[in-house]
Amino acid sequence: MGMATMQYMNVRTAAQKWGLTERRVRILCSEGRVDGVIRNGWGWNIPIGAPKPQDGRRLRRIKNIGLRPGAANYAALDGLKETFSVQKDDQGYVVRTFRSLLPPFLSGSFCFDGVDISLRQVESLFEGGFPAGLTQTQMLLCFNTRTILLRAMQETGLGPIFAGPHDEPYLSERKLKRLYRTLLSGIDDLSLCEYRKASIPAGGAGGYKVFPVSQQMAILMYQYEKEWQSLHPLIRSSFLFGELMRIRPFGSFDGLFALIAMGCELLSAGYPVEVIPAERIPELRADLSLTQKRGNYQNLIALFESSLERSLQLLMRKKEEHV
């Protein structure tokens, strides 16, 4: 059905149809748990055919309770971050250096998704060139990713860059869908960013039980919003990345999207984005497989930790040392 012929219902009608209170429907709309919902002033336009949203509060039985970060000491990382956070002046250098992290971020992310795009190709694209071998879709993904991460950096602040108004916590189910829609800008502008229609084993369920992707995303965001906020940001963002890779909510550009979401979460806590260069992607895949099979995040977290330490050291170099 095209956008011009889409029919909508209001909150009261949806509440009656789904057997929920109007207040609960508004909350689910604001959290992004209603497919295709559109904000209309103070109200919400809900597609007539939208399925009843899953409520994370009622899905605790399938939450992933097997996530294990392992023993670790983040004193070195937090010390670097603290030093960087009190740095004054030189906002221009921080922005330039942050932008320089994006080509290796993208080259590695594409490699993670099985696409061979070199660091130099991305750098050339961002310098205004048209590098051979890049498709239009790949170019748009590069530009859209840059937009998402630069916007997140401006909203949440980074080092001497002051934060603007932003949500706390920064991510939500609605925000993730909005990020994915931005990622698809110019590629699929008609997408409602609905979850793929599939059922997969849940991380915390015993036996061989499977649950729809929509249910698993609801419980993932419930855990993120209610249970993981007290965790160290590196652990929380790593759990988010691992679960997004397990669920693969949209079915396209899964690795890139999961790494973008992790980067946004890290930025909201005052850290730069994680940068895993293409040559370390085999290590990332191996570490990720441990999280899927055993819930063991220790190696994955250590990989991301070393990446953040390198990025923080770059961001704190003297201006004259940067070439």
Please describe what each predicted stretch is.
Residues G2-K17, E22-I27, E31-R33, N40, ...:
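FIC/Doc superfamily catalytic core
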